[in-house]
Curated annotation (Swiss-Prot):
Compartment(s): Cell membrane
Family: Belongs to the NRAMP family.
Signal peptide: none
Listed transmembrane segments: 41-61, 69-89, 117-137, 147-167, 176-196, 215-235, 270-290, 307-327, 363-383, 384-404, 424-444
GO biological process: iron ion transmembrane transport
One GO MF term: symporter activity
Short name of any one Pfam family annotated for the protein: Nramp
Membrane topology term: Multi-pass membrane protein
The encoding gene: mntH
GO cellular component: plasma membrane
Function of the protein: H(+)-stimulated, divalent metal cation uptake system.
Key words of the record: Cell membrane, Ion transport, Membrane, Symport, Transmembrane, Transmembrane helix, Transport
Main location: membrane
Protein known as: Divalent metal cation transporter MntH
C-alpha cells in the first residue's frame, strides 16, 4: 500500500493522458531553432490575442459604457487593476499547459472525482453558452445598427459564422490567430478614432488611473466597479489558454518549457495590454461624449450608438462604433468554439466533430436570444446580456481555484511550481474573486 502511494505521488496524475489537448492542432506551429529573440517571439505570438478577445466582448462594453457615462474617468483605475489580475491568472493557465502537457479541463478531470468533474464540466459549458449569448447579442445589435436588420433575424444570421470557424480550423491554427489579431486591431483603430473625435480631458484621464476612495464609499460606483472586475476575467479563457499554448513546437524539456513560459507571458501580457487600451477607450469615449455633456444614464449599447453622432458632431462616429461591435462579436465566436471543444474533450473525453460541437453551442445560445427578442425586443436583449455576465461570474471561481491549486502543487509542476510569494498572491486573488462574485450574485438577486 505504501509503495503504491509512493508510486502515485511520483506520477502526480491518477491516469495517463488519453490524447493531447486539441490534438488536431497540438504541436503544429513551428518554432525556429537557433533563431534570434524577436524571430522566436513572433512564432510564439498568437495565443495571447485569442485570450484577449474575451476581455473586449459585448459584456465588457456594457459595463465600460455605464461606468464612463455615469462617473466619468474615475473607474479607469478599476479597468487597470482588472487587467493586472488577468495577466496573473492567464500566466498561470499557460504555465499549467506548458509544464504538464494538460489543459485545465484535463487536469481537473484527473484530479477530482467523476461526479465533481461532471459538475465542473456543466458549469464550464454554461459559461461558454453565456459567453456565446453575449457574442450573438453583440453581433445582432451591430447588424441592426449597420444594416437595419431586425434583431431577431440578426440573431439567426449569427449561426452562419459556424462555417467561418470550420473553414479557418481546416486551413490551420495560424489562420485563426491572424483573423483574430486583424479584428482586434480593427476594434482598437475604431475606438482610437472615436477618442480623437470626442476630445477627452487628458489630465482627467491620467487622474482616472489613480484609485480614488469614492469608488468604495459610493455604493452605485462600487457596484459598477465590481461589475467591471467581475466581467473581465472570463472562465473559458483559462481553459482555452492552457490548451492553445501547446500548439507551439517548443522542446518538451526543462529549458524548452522555461523558454515557452517566458515567450507565452510576453505574448499574453502584450495582447492583454491591447485589451486594456480598448476597454479604457470605451470608458473614456463614454465619459467624454456622455458624462461631460450631462447624459449620465446611457442604458445600453444601442443608446450609446444613437447618441454618438449628435454628441460628437460626426456622421461616421456611430458607424465606426457599430463596425467595432461587429468585429468584437465575430472575434469571440472563434474562441468560444475552441473553448467548447477543450472542455468537452478534457472533462468527458468525448470528441465531437467541430461542426456538431459548434452547432450545439450556437443553438443553445440562439434559442434564448430569439425567444427574448421576440417577446421583449431590444430591452429584453440588454437584460439577457446582463444575465449572461451574471452566469459567467458564478462560474469563474470554479475555474480559478483549481488553476491556483494545480500550479501551486509541486507534485504536478515540479520545479515550475509557484514560488511562495506567488502562491500567496494567487490565493488572495482567487479568494477576492470568489467574494466579489458572491456579492455580485447576491446584489443581482436582491434587485430583481
Amino acid at each position: 500500500m505504501k509503495k503504491e502511494k509512493t508510486e502515485r505521488t511520483k506520477q502526480s496524475w491518477r491516469k495517463a493522458q488519453n490524447a493531447p489537448s486539441l490534438s488536431e492542432v497540438n504541436n503544429s506551429v513551428a518554432i525556429p531553432k537557433n533563431a534570434k529573440f524577436f524571430r522566436k517571439l513572433f512564432a510564439f505570438m498568437g495565443p495571447g490575442a485569442l485570450i484577449a478577445v474575451g476581455y473586449v466582448d459585448p459584456g465588457n462594453w456594457a459595463t465600460s459604457i455605464a461606468g464612463g457615462s455615469e462617473f466619468g474617468y474615475t473607474l479607469l483605475s478599476v479597468i487597470l487593476i482588472s487587467n493586472i489580475l488577468a495577466v496573473l491568472l492567464q500566466s498561470l493557465a499557460s504555465k499549467l499547459g506548458i509544464v504538464t502537457g494538460r489543459d485545465l479541463a484535463q487536469a481537473s478531470s484527473d484530479h477530482f472525482s467523476k461526479p465533481f468533474g461532471f459538475v465542473l464540466w456543466i458549469l464550464a459549458e454554461l459559461a461558454i453558452i453565456a459567453t456565446d449569448i453575449a457574442e450573438v447579442i453583440g453581433s445582432a445589435i451591430a447588424l441592426n445598427l449597420l444594416f437595419g436588420i431586425p434583431l431577431i433575424w440578426g440573431v439567426c444570421i449569427t449561426a452562419l459564422d459556424i462555417f467561418l470557424v470550420l473553414f479557418l480550423q481546416h486551413k490551420g491554427f495560424r489562420y485563426i490567430e491572424v483573423i483574430v489579431i486583424t479584428l482586434m486591431v480593427t476594434i482598437l483603430v475604431c475606438f482610437g478614432a472615436e477618442m480623437v473625435m470626442s476630445h477627452p480631458d487628458m489630465q482627467a484621464i491620467a487622474k482616472g488611473f489613480i484609485p480614488q476612495s469614492e469608488i468604495v464609499t459610493n455604493p452605485a460606483m462600487l457596484y459598477i466597479a465590481l461589475g467591471i472586475l467581475g466581467a473581465t476575467v472570463m472562465p473559458h479563457n483559462l481553459y482555452l489558454h492552457s490548451s492553445i499554448v501547446q500548439t507551439r513546437q517548443y522542446a518538451r524539456t526543462k529549458e524548452g518549457k522555461k523558454e515557452a513560459i517566458r515567450f507565452s507571458f510576453i505574448d499574453s501580457t502584450f495582447s492583454l495590454t491591447i485589451a486594456l487600451l480598448i476597454n479604457a477607450s470605451i470608458l473614456i469615449l463614454a465619459a467624454a461624449a456622455f458624462y461631460t455633456t450631462g447624459q449620465h444614464n446611457v442604458a445600453g449599447i444601442e443608446d450609446a450608438y444613437k447618441l454618438l453622432n449628435p454628441t460628437l458632431g460626426s456622421s461616421i462616429a456611430s458607424t465606426v462604433f457599430a463596425v467595432a461591435l461587429l468585429a468584437s462579436g465575430q472575434n469571440s465566436t472563434l474562441t468560444g468554439t475552441l473553448a467548447g471543444q477543450i472542455v468537452m474533450e478534457g472533462f468527458l473525453n468525448i470528441r465531437l466533430k467541430p461542426v456538431v460541437r459548434r452547432l450545439l453551442t450556437r443553438v443553445l445560445a440562439i434559442v434564448p436570444a430569439v425567444i427574448i427578442t421576440a417577446l421583449y425586443g431590444a430591452n429584453g436583449i440588454n437584460e439577457l446580456l446582463i444575465f449572461s455576465q451574471v452566469i459567467l461570474s458564478m462560474q469563474l471561481s470554479f475555474a480559478v481555484i483549481p488553476l491556483v491549486m494545480f500550479t501551486s502543487d509541486k507534485e504536478k509542476m515540479g520545479e515550475f511550481v509557484n514560488p511562495s510569494w506567488l502562491k500567496i498572491i494567487s490565493w488572495a486573488v482567487a479568494i477576492f474573486i470568489a467574494i466579489l462574485n458572491i456579492y455580485l450574485l447576491f446584489y443581482t438577486i436582491t434587485t430583481l
